[in-house]
Amino acid sequence: RILLQEHSRFLHRYSVSDKGGCGYLMEKYYLAVDIGASSGRHILGHMENGKIELEEIYRFENGMDHKDGKLLWDVNRLFGEILNGMKKCKELGKLPVSMAIDTWAVDYVLLDEKDQILGDTYGYRDHRTDGMDAEVAKILPETELYARTGIQKQIFNTIYQLMAVEKKTPEIMKQAKTLLMLPDYFGFRLTGNKLSEYTNGSTTQL
């Protein structure tokens, strides 16, 4: 569930000037952005005397928004919090050489041909997936699905979320060009690179 990203764009936008002296730091720092369902934090790590030293530099609250009976994630706010923590690195004069973004599993965004998010970004606790397991089973029996993926059936798995999109808002599915899991989406916003990190991708049951 961890997506490693090179930080070239981060350095371009938030680098400290050489006059400040921070450009000559020899210490190598690595940034982990750990986002959970109720909070997120930025952790800087570095090696000191042969040991890994960890430092929490930024923390923020998280949670699903209730809107028109739906449970949704505000991905723009979350991305803003990621940037806030990165700016904190600049304030501390501790620029990471690389970073990773980690969130919960199964939730995703669909992007159109212009890389804009289609529809709402649902949270895994939303009930739109109720009954979608039966719809998937009409196409692929549960035993065969498990044989292919080896993933435990959970009604919030991405496969059932996508079936809900197909059944309830098919126009969104027709416009969709890319699916990105949430950590991969944030990484895309930072780097411009689209990819699917294997371990998080395995939680989709796809």
Give, region by region, the residue ranges found by the protein language model.
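Hinge/lid segment of periplasmic solute-binding proteins
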Residues: 130-141
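N-terminal glycine/serine-rich phosphate-binding loop of ATP-dependent small-molecule kinases
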Residues: 12, 18-120, 130-131, 147, ...
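Gly/Ser/Thr-rich active-site cleft segment
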Residues: 35-37, 50, 145-206
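Carbohydrate-associated surface elements
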Residues: 126
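N-terminal amphipathic/hydrophobic targeting modules at extreme N-termini
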Residues: 2-8
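Residue-level signal for well-ordered alpha-helical scaffold segments within enzymatic catalytic domains
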Residues: 84, 88-91, 134-135, 164-168, ...
